[in-house]
Amino acid sequence: MNTTKFVAVLAAAALVACSDTEVGPTAPERDALAAANGPAVASASGGGRMVLEVFGFTIPQVLGFSARRHADGSASGHINYRQTFEGETFHFVATVTCMAIYDGNRVKYGGVLTRSNDPTVPVGDYMWFQSIDNGEGEGSPADVSTGSGFGSEAENEAFCASPESPDPIFLAEVIGDIQVRE
């Protein structure tokens, strides 16, 4: 990871860490979850800042996530996401319920919202993302991610289960880092 990416990841982590809301399960809760579901057979994590330019809108976002798929097929982890739209900042926290890796470097993950300050997307709804790890080092293109999708549990599970690649219009460069491991 180059120095610029490393500093950006640290800055994003500091923003998430300084949040006044919880970002996911505590270390003992994560350990208990991993023990109950078996070892992770695949994982993805990372985040950073993104700016999505879509349909004439500029939407600044901060994403941080950790997702694991376990030997029994279940998924665990957390997602912490902020987006600013037309001057209002929305913050969402979710517990990961699905995760799948495609093409070796592309991860789809989603989960149930445990925190939301957006009255149109309440706790109990689901959100999902697709992120691409484009490698490390000088000359590697930036990692990219979609903005969030929101909907029902069935839509969340269908999203993770579909190998379909993201529409490039919904991808933004991540100023940070995404790691995908199988």
What are the roles of these predicted feature ranges?
Residues 50, 56-132:
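Predominantly extracellular/secreted and cell-surface proteins with exposed
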Residues 139-182:
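C-terminal partner/receptor-binding element of secreted or periplasmic proteins
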Residues 19, 97-99, 157-163:
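Sequence contexts marking disulfide-bonded cysteines in secreted/extracellular proteins
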Residues 27-45:
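Post-signal peptide N-terminal segment of mature Sec-exported envelope proteins
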